[in-house]
A protein has these predicted regions:
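Extracytosolic ligand-binding ectodomains
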Residues: 4-392
Length: 392
């Protein structure tokens, strides 16, 4: 197996700094100016998304502190969360001869960045369509999630998976999942986005009323029998809500938040148990509100390395006395990636290094950058009573 290029700042970079001391001595003829690594930071530092932008900026500053190299300089600019201001700030980076920028966050802000030459942008977006040629989509994208789920599906041998998504919402994700054809779905359904109507639609999908009537008919037959075996069966059936199995073995729900909870609760009310049927969804960023509800037990989702995320969040909180935005760890990793490439190329940053075919390992886990996407080797977690358990 080819060795991964590891750049995890906390564990690796400090070693790298020490181990490169000899190289620095042998390159004393290189001027200090040539050793400077200038990194642009393009985030929404004001406006509606200011809190997200400030959280990512603090993560980058935390990474800068951990690297502890005075020759790395960051230059933050405000994208204001829109394409025009992102473009205008990028033009200023161009004037400053900055070649690498962390940001923007949102896909909408990338609109005009392909007009900026000689700069590569590492964006936190998880969308993969219409990415400018000078931009790397560094978010936890569908490709990575589907590839990981495919491997897990093969391992646990599910073959009849339902794909469910709300009408009108998350069209991008649902259409992308279908087009990629990585996962094979037994049937595809869409449901009303109104939580009050979801239960009725799930009942139809699971044929709840038919299964309930089958139970009632069977009970009536058994009630007329005097046979011991029928009486024994009757006692068992009286504890049930339906009779018969559903015609699927797994469900993949493209949803989030309260509506996701409503969908899973509706399956439970329709007498479809998560102990018998596997339930999956997209990356939930370890949302603690998933705890405490029986219908969410054993819900599975792909995500980054949870242990590393908890360590990062603890370190961030200790430094800033506040919780980071969940995607802040990506900004931390982005700086580590840039530093790794720079320090391992005689303090000369080259864009081609980002596309190393052996891949990298950050706090988020292993990944490789290919076709302007960060393809992550994710893990699968399931929701337990008060914890997330890694199952793959």
């Amino acid at each position: 197996m080819k060795k991964l290029l590891i750049f995890s700042i906390i564990t690796y970079l400090l070693v790298t700094i020490n181990s490169t001391a000899d190289n620095q001595n042998s390159n004393e003829n290189i001027s200090e100016d040539e050793k400077i690594l200038k990194v642009g930071v393009l985030l929404p530092l004001s406006g509606k998304f200011e809190n997200i932008g400030q959280s990512l900026l603090k993560s980058i500053q935390l990474g800068l502190f951990d690297i502890d190299n005075k020759n790395i300089k960051i230059y933050p600019k405000d994208s204001k969360g829109n394409a025009l201001d992102a473009y205008l700030s990028a033009k200023k980076f161009q004037e400053m001869e900055i070649e690498i920028v962390i940001g923007p966050i949102f896909h909408e802000s990338l609109e005009r960045l392909d007009e900026i030459s000689n700069i590569t942008f590492i964006s936190a977006t998880n969308k993969t369509q219409e990415i400018p040629k000078n931009t790397i989509a560094f978010g936890i994208n569908l490709d990575s999630q589907m590839n990981t789920l495919k491997k897990y599906f093969d391992e646990i041998k599910v073959s009849k998976t339902l794909l469910l998504s709300p009408r009108s919402d998350f069209n991008y994700q649902t259409e992308s999942i279908a087009k990629k054809d990585i996962l094979k779905f037994y049937r595809t359904y869409s449901y009303d986005s109104d939580p009050k109507k979801i239960t009725g639609e799930i009942e139809k999908i699971t044929k709840y009323r038919e299964r309930k009537k089958d139970l009632e008919r069977r009970i009536k037959i058994l009630e007329k029998s005097e046979l011991d075996k029928d009486k024994h069966e009757l006692k068992k059936l009286e504890q049930k809500h339906t009779l018969g199995k559903v015609n699927f073995d797994s469900v993949f729900v493209v949803d989030f938040g309260e509506r996701l909870k409503s969908v899973l609760a509706s399956f439970m009310f329709s007498d479809v148990s998560s102990e018998k049927i596997n339930f999956f969804t997209l990356n939930q960023w370890f949302d603690n509100t998933l705890f405490g509800e029986n219908s969410l037990r054993n819900l599975h989702f792909p995500s980054i390395d949870y242990d590393n995320l908890k360590k990062f969040e603890k370190r961030y909180f200790k430094t800033y006395n506040e919780k980071p935005n969940e995607i802040s760890i990506l900004a931390y990793d982005a700086l580590g990636l840039i530093y790794y490439c720079w320090s391992n190329n005689n303090f000369n940053f080259k864009i081609d290094q980002l596309f190393n075919k052996n891949g990298f390992k950050g706090l988020q886990g292993e990944f490789i950058i290919k076709d302007n996407l960060s393809l992550q080797k994710l893990k699968i977690y399931k929701v337990a009573e008060k914890e997330f358990i890694k199952v793959y």
